[in-house]
């Protein structure tokens, strides 16, 4: 059986350079149908590996800047706020909190230009990270790569922060990790802020190994976009959710919000403000030898990181979390 490649035609020959580059890059990078290949599984793995290579050649700034993303962000509306400028001569790990149900704020702020990231932080190329399994799905994989999204695997993070950039070693690059992950989504209740963070220190060790400064990010309103069934009131549901998490790496919160033509039941998020505040960077001293990274230094940076999150909360809670029913809480 012969192998067929389906390439995108150059239909934008009269358009902007960015438009044509985006199409030709996707064509050259293997926008193919795996089922028509002699070795579909091998091809699928090789295409998925592009998400961990640290190579941003599939990133399409034209797609990231489409007007549809501005419409998407204005639905809530979502806004991005900067505590202070970031130097393009450093590299960064942005830690996004909370996860919420779907992390709408993380997508709007760091996977698109709808909120003006490039204007707020000129010279910094930020890559939003997600589960590696998302890059094993044909078509969706190409879409994610074009949006500048990459795998959250350790290999991917290290490659992104140690290759390319201004100096060929990651200068001017950043990654955004939703630190709380699937576990935190189960605590995504309106008007609360419960962060799964006490034991999450892998990203701190990654920062030390790569020499990337830590940048805490707090999204006010992320947990307010959906209502969720409280799993602690339903032990069977909670056990099932945790089983799915351990098996598949993600969980399935039971949630609802509004519909297209009603405000009571549906899967569309509520129209509630999203204010994403980027905190002050925490300087990290690089230690290339992973085995020699000191636990005391990891704990010290983790403590500074939590303190910066708490500072953001205290500074902005009366403006962006007026309807809160509790204060910020950091749990294991």
Task: Give a label for each model feature.
Residues 285, 308, 312-319:
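Hydrophobic alpha-helical segments
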């Amino acid at each position: 059986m012969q192998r067929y490649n389906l390439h995108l035609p150059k239909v934008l020959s009269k358009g902007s350079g960015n438009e044509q580059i985006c199409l030709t890059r996707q064509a050259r990078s293997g926008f193919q149908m795996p089922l028509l290949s002699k070795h579909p599984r091998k091809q699928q793995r090789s295409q998925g590996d592009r998400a961990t290579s640290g190579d941003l050649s599939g990133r399409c700034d034209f797609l990231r800047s489409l007007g549809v993303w501005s419409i998407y962000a204005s639905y809530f509306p979502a806004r991005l706020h900067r505590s202070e400028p970031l130097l393009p001569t450093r590299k960064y790990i942005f830690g996004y909190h909370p996860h919420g149900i779907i992390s709408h704020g993380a997508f709007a702020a760091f996977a698109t230009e709808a909120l003006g990231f490039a204007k707020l932080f000129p010279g910094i190329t930020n890559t939003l990270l997600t589960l590696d399994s998302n890059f094993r799905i044909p078509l969706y994989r190409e879409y994610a790569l074009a949006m500048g999204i990459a795998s959250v695997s350790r290999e991917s993070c290290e490659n992104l922060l140690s290759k390319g950039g201004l100096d060929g070693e990651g200068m001017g690059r950043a990654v955004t990790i939703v630190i709380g992950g699937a576990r935190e989504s189960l605590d995504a209740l309106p008007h609360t802020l419960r962060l799964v963070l006490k034991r999450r220190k892998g990203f701190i060790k990654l920062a030390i190994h790569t020499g990337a400064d830590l940048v805490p990010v707090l999204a006010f309103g992320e947990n307010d976009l959906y209502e969720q069934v409280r799993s602690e009131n339903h032990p069977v549901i909670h056990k099932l959710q945790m089983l799915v998490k351990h098996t598949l790496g993600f969980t399935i919160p039971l949630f609802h919000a509004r519909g297209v033509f009603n405000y009571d039941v549906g899967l569309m998020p509520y129209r509630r403000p999203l204010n994403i505040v980027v905190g002050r960077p925490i300087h990290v001293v690089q230690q290339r030898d992973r085995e020699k990274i000191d636990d005391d230094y990891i704990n010290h940076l983790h403590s500074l990181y939590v303190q910066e999150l708490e500072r953001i909360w205290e500074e902005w809670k009366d403006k962006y979390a007026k309807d809160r029913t509790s204060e910020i809480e950091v749990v294991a």
